From Swiss-Prot:
CDD domains the record matches: ALDH_F18-19_ProA-GPR
Catalytic activity: L-glutamate 5-semialdehyde + phosphate + NADP(+) = L-glutamyl 5-phosphate + NADPH + H(+)
Gene name of this polypeptide: proA
Superkingdom to which the source organism belongs: Bacteria
Residue stretches spanning the membrane: none
Assigned EC number: 1.2.1.41
Function: Catalyzes the NADPH-dependent reduction of L-glutamate 5-phosphate into L-glutamate 5-semialdehyde and phosphate. The product spontaneously undergoes cyclization to form 1-pyrroline-5-carboxylate.
Entry's localization field: Cytoplasm
Record organism: Nitratidesulfovibrio vulgaris (strain ATCC 29579 / DSM 644 / CCUG 34227 / NCIMB 8303 / VKM B-1760 / Hildenborough)
Listed pathway(s): Amino-acid biosynthesis; L-proline biosynthesis; L-glutamate 5-semialdehyde from L-glutamate: step 2/2
Family, similarity comment: Belongs to the gamma-glutamyl phosphate reductase family.
Name of protein: Gamma-glutamyl phosphate reductase
Length: 419
């Protein structure tokens, strides 16, 4: 069977499985998720062995450190995946819930019911944990899903796929509800993008090149998990000691992830006191500063002059753009020009400035006096996420179970006819 036929067959089987899954009981779905958590714990050694094969191949191919970090599984990350399974299992099941109702003058009772999106195709790179997160969220929301991970994670993804299949079968749910593409041929992506008859929405999660390619090729709606060019604005009068720790966490904890900080905008009033403290705190961790002319002398030996192309750059590394700004207007203008609608934060003591920043900074999460690293489904209480949408339709921000459903109108009558 050639690739086109193989992918079309997967789409047909996903559509059939999705119809069954949409009618599945909450107990059956929760049972599959709980069993998957147990399997992840019991089969940890096999998962780590598969991941080791991927890591060895990636190292031989010269993969850079940030991508290696995203590829790597550990006992701790497997424990986190198991915990996410149990957390999502315990969440309220949205499918079939009638969220709101109102009565019309003619007596009709009108409501909106939560329903699955249908069949989702997920295309992603490097991260094996996305295989589990995507599967459990789609399952909970009643969606079938076709998962196409990166070739660099193929052994890890297939090992996890086997556990998902086992968990589904254990409670009588269709194994085809979650399918992982087993071939690494990149032609698969183009074939998935053609299947509008069988796939309702496609979600690319990865580098800018992948996302643009999917947007260009897809015949169905695309929910984009675009790059994370995240900024922090240090307001006049901010708590500088607190801000230093926020910036350190946002940049240094995991510099290769999409909610890591990439740009630091500092009010001119605070630059002389704040930037040397930042240089000392972050410089000890090897952060390189790409600095504007005004900030360069305040950052010491760790700073180099910024270039125009550094604006809007997702560095995925221990590199931070630094600019001094005159006021919030200039900070917001920079964010509007170079941000990616992902995450923006402000450090301030001024409530009015905080509320203005929340209103005017255009991003899927805007935070006051907190790290950008909190833009994450688990951290925001969603249990897990299939991605962080930077598109405002159909969802904006981390996509959990609720965001993988839509609504339909339901009407209760007593024989009414339209006049």
């Amino acid at each position: 069977m050639n690739i086109a036929s193989q992918i079309e067959d997967m789409g047909r089987r996903a559509r059939a499985a999705g119809r069954r899954l949409a009618a599945a009981s909450p107990a059956a779905k929760a049972g599959a998720l709980d069993h998957l958590a147990t399997l992840l714990e019991q089969r940890q050694d096999a998962i780590l062995a598969a991941n080791a094969a991927d890591l060895a191949a990636a190292a031989e191919a010269g993969m850079d450190a940030p991508r290696m970090d995203r590829l790597r599984l550990t006992p701790a990350t497997i424990a986190e995946m198991a915990a996410a399974c149990r957390h999502v299992a315990a969440l309220p099941d949205p499918v079939g819930a009638i969220e709101t109702q109102w009565q019309r003058p003619n007596g009709l009772l009108v409501g909106k019911m939560r329903i699955p999106l249908g069949v989702i195709a997920m295309i992603y790179e490097s991260r094996p944990n996305v295989t589990i997160d995507s599967a459990i969220l789609c399952l909970k929301a009643g969606n079938a899903v076709i998962l196409r991970g990166g070739s660099e994670a193929i052994h890890s993804n297939l090992a996890l796929a086997a556990l998902i299949t086992e968990a589904l079968s254990s409670v009588g749910l269709p194994a085809e509800a979650v399918q992982v593409v087993s071939t690494t041929d990149r032609a698969v992506i183009a074939e998935l993008c053609k299947l509008e008859e069988h796939i309702d929405v496609i979600i690319p999660r990865g580098g800018e090149t992948l996302i643009r390619a999917v947007v260009d090729m897809a015949r169905m709606p695309v929910l984009k998990h675009y790059k994370g060019v995240c900024h922090a604005y240090i307001d006049s009068g901010a708590d500088l000691a607190q801000a230093v720790e926020i910036i350190h966490n946002a940049k240094v904890q995991r510099p290769g992830v999409c909610n890591a900080l990439e740009g630091l905008l500092v009010h001119r009033d605070e630059a002389a006191a704040f930037l040397p403290a930042i240089a000392e705190r972050l410089g000890n961790d090897g952060v390189e500063f790409r600095a504007c002319p005004a900030s360069l002398p305040l950052l010491g030996d760790s700073a180099i002059p910024m270039k125009d192309e550094d604006n809007g750059q997702e560095f995925h590394d221990l590199i931070l753009l630094v600019r001094i700004v005159d006021d919030m207007d200039e900070a917001l203008a920079h964010i509007a020009a170079y941000g990616s609608n992902h995450t923006e934060i402000i450090c301030t003591r001024d409530h009015g400035n905080a509320m203005r920043f929340l209103r005017e900074a255009d991003a899927s999460m805007v935070a006051v006096n907190a790290s950008s690293r909190f833009n994450d489904g688990g951290q925001l209480g969603l249990g897990a996420e299939i991605g962080i949408s930077t598109s405002k339709l159909h969802s904006y921000g981390p996509m959990g179970v609720q965001e993988l459903t839509t609504t339909k109108f339901v009407v209760f009558g007593a024989g009414q006819i339209r006049q």
